[in-house]
């Protein structure tokens, strides 16, 4: 029977790969033969089936068919990765295609939710910044993912680089597998399979490394140079792979303590934080005096409901932000029209559409609910395609590195220590919002250009501070669970509020913004507005065209919010598109950041210092990567049976498991 099953799997594997190869062969033949046989449809004067025709055909195949229509399309790219993974596992053609289809649809759902989230939240943040205060950044991994997608989609005229995130994820996963495969040297034994977390982290690392490491490389036209794209993917992937290998391995032993030897590690946003809490817990209390022995009030249980708590936090936050806007706005245009609807200020009029003809007060509530709904859409889309991608990744890793430990979502440990989660959550809320209050006060320092106000949302608070409660309790009892999450949360907000502003400032000195400030708008305008001599439209357009430096971006932002923008679309859509591109000057952190311990504290310190100078940034990223490799040598991974070569070289004496 077993041999029969293996034979069926081999048959499915052969059939699946044959179909995949056949499809690619048909695409290549049709593209090359049609393009070489009918070259005059594109380029006049080229002889059909000549050497030049075939050369043009192959360039078209690579750049347009595979690069632009596949490798730069993240939904299709991830779908094909799932397809290949399932085929490698012998799932058969039908199941592989269904898995790929779910992946594509899930990513499209993510994109829809991201678009709604960013378009709803951004006008509020832009208006807050326009009041003269510092910016507000929401700490939430899905806001962060949406912000990164928006940056790579809209920052480069007619170029979409979201697929770079997927490439970084793929390289990182390969590096993770290689490191675990070389565990005799690396001392790492854990493979990340939490795809949604990996995607969020790949988005943050890829976008921020572009700003920190590649911001001064001149653009190729209005796009990222090919060498910079390759370098960005490689350095991001290596950093991610080393981080995933080391940090997840470091959670294995203490997770076994929490779960009574369940045999998995954690693959989430706070793995280094978990290691830190586990080491510090014993200094704050007695692990035998556990939080699980305490009785909690029933009223606190309501905060375990994800949707309820997200709604309360987001609604409260945006009500406060709108109160600040209403109390402080002093612009020329009316903010409110007849105390009923928002005026055309920074795009705030989008909030009028939530409940149709309702008053602005109801639309504020509706807008907050709309953002919660978009977050749910993002999470649903992510779960949909990650479920498929995760199975493909896990299956591949099991075949390549048998016996490796799987790193799973942090929620897997919550059932083992429910009270500790609540202790950590409440402690984190107090500590982080105390830091928010301090950063809000700092934001009122005149001329503040050195800090943002980072505000944590539910996912950050519950899955970051709640996790710390669990691991602090395991080593230091209820006192550690009640104190450590708040202390670490406080430090997180302080560090990341300064770090994100530094990154945003670095973006303002990037080659991308230089390209926007020097883009030849006059050539695009040409004579298209000659029939509008003396008109308000031509005057408004010329203000943008003739502006220089930062003033051009400011003028472009004002222009796209005016009625003249729609008029220009009808006359010269190419010029209108270019001006709209110039107006979009948000850095990849302005609309959201991942917001959990490893990224607020450790990665936050890295980019805070590294963003000041590109060379310094490269040095720090390399040192951080090497540091993670060395950190793996002193980690007790719980399954080590022999001393590694690096441990011998560094004279480290690890704890060996002689029973394996």
Curated annotation (Swiss-Prot):
| Membrane topology designation | Multi-pass membrane protein
Q: Where on the tree of life does the source sit, at the highest rank?
A: Bacteria
Q: Which residues bind L-ascorbate?
A: 141-142, 196-200, 268-269, 409
Residue ranges annotated as transmembrane are 14-34, 74-94, 98-118, 162-182, 194-214, 224-244, 307-327, 362-382, 401-421, 422-442, 450-470, 592-612, 615-635
Is Membrane among the key words of this record? yes
Q: What InterPro entries does the annotation carry? A: Ascorbate-PTS_EIIC (IPR051562), PTS_sugar-sp_permease (IPR004703)
Which Pfam family, any one of them, does this sequence belong to? Answer: EIIC-GAT
Which subcellular locations apply to this protein?
Cell membrane
Q: Which GO terms describe its cellular component?
A: plasma membrane
Cite a single GO BP annotation.
phosphoenolpyruvate-dependent sugar phosphotransferase system
- Keywords noted in UniProt: Cell membrane, Membrane, Phosphotransferase system, Sugar transport, Transmembrane, Transmembrane helix, Transport
Leader sequence range is none
- Described purpose of this protein according to its UniProt entry: The phosphoenolpyruvate-dependent sugar phosphotransferase system (sugar PTS), a major carbohydrate active transport system, catalyzes the phosphorylation of incoming sugar substrates concomitantly with their translocation across the cell membrane. The enzyme II UlaABC PTS system is involved in ascorbate transport.
Q: What is known of its domains?
A: In classical PTS systems, the PTS EIIC type-2 domain forms the translocation channel and contains the specific substrate-binding site. UlaA does not exhibit the topological features of any recognized enzyme IIC.
Q: Which family does it belong to?
A: Belongs to the UlaA family.
Oligomeric form and interacting partners = Homodimer.
Q: Can you say what this protein is called?
A: Ascorbate-specific PTS system EIIC component
**What organism is recorded for this protein?**
Mycoplasma pneumoniae (strain ATCC 29342 / M129 / Subtype 1)
């Amino acid at each position: 029977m077993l041999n029969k099953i293996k034979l069926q799997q081999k048959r499915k594997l052969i059939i699946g790969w044959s179909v995949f190869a056949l499809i690619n062969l048909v695409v290549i033949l049709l593209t090359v033969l049609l393009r070489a046989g009918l070259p005059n449809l594109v380029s006049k004067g080229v002889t059909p089936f000549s050497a030049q025709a075939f050369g043009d055909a192959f360039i078209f195949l690579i750049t347009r068919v595979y690069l632009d229509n596949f490798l730069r399309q993240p939904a299709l790219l991830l779908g094909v990765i799932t397809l290949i993974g399932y085929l490698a596992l012998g799932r058969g053609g039908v199941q592989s295609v269904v898995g790929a289809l779910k992946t594509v649809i899930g990513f499209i759902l993510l994109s829809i939710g991201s678009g709604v989230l960013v378009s709803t939240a951004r006008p509020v943040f832009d208006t807050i910044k326009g009041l003269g205060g510092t910016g507000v950044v929401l700490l939430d991994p899905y806001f962060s993912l949406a912000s990164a997608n928006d940056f790579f989609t809209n920052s480069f005229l007619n170029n979409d680089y979201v697929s770079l995130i997927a490439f970084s994820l793929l390289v990182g996963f390969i590096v993770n597998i290689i490191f675990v495969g070389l565990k005799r040297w690396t001392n790492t034994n854990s493979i990340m399979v939490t795809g949604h977390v990996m995607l969020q982290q790949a988005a943050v690392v890829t976008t921020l490394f572009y700003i920190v490491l590649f911001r001064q490389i001149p653009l190729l036209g209005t796009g990222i140079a090919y060498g910079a794209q390759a370098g960005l993917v490689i350095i991001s992937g290596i950093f991610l792979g080393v981080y995933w290998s080391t940090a997840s391995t470091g959670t294995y032993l203490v997770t076994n303590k929490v779960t009574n030897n369940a045999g998995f590690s954690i693959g989430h946003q706070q793995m280094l934080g978990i290691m830190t809490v586990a080491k510090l817990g014993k200094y704050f209390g007695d692990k035998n005096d556990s939080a699980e022995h305490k009785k909690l009030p029933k009223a606190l249980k309501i905060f375990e409901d994800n949707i309820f708590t997200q709604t309360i936090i987001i609604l409260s936050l945006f009500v406060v932000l709108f109160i600040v806007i209403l109390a402080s706005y002093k612009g020329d245009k009316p903010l409110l029209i007849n105390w009923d609807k928002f005026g055309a200020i920074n795009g705030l009029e989008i909030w009028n559409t939530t409940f149709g003809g309702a008053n602005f007060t109801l639309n504020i509530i509706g807008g907050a609910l709309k953002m919660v709904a978009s977050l749910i859409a993002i999470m649903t889309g992510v779960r949909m395609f990650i479920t498929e991608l995760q199975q493909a990744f896990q299956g591949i890793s099991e075949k390549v590195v048998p016996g490796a430990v799987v790193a799973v979502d942090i929620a897997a440990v919550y059932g083992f220590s429910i009270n500790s989660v609540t202790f950590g959550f409440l402690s984190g809320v107090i500590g982080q919002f105390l830091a928010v209050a301090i950063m809000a006060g700092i934001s009122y320092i005149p001329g503040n250009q050195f800090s943002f106000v980072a505000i944590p949302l539910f996912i950050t608070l519950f899955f970051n501070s709640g996790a710390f409660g669990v691991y602090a309790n395991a080593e230091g009892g209820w006192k550690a669970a009640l104190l450590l999450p708040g202390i670490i949360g406080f430090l997180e907000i302080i560090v990341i509020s300064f770090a994100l502003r530094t990154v945003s400032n670095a973006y303002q000195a990037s080659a991308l913004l230089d390209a926007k400030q020097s883009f030849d708008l006059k050539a695009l305008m040409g004579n298209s507005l000659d029939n509008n001599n003396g008109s308000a439209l031509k005057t408004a357009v010329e203000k943008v065209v003739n502006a220089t430096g930062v003033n051009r971006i400011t003028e472009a932002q004002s222009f796209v919010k005016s009625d003249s923008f729609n008029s220009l679309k009808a006359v010269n859509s190419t010029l209108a598109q270019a001006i709209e591109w110039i107006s979009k000057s948000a850095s990849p952190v302005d609309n959201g950041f991942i917001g959990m311990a490893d990224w607020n504290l450790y990665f936050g310190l890295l980019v805070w210092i590294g963003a000041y100078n590109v060379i310094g940034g490269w040095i720090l990223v390399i040192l951080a990567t090497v540091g993670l490799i060395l950190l793996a040598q002193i980690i007790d991974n719980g399954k080590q049976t022999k001393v590694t070569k690096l441990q011998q070289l560094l004279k480290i004496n690890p704890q060996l498991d002689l029973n394996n």
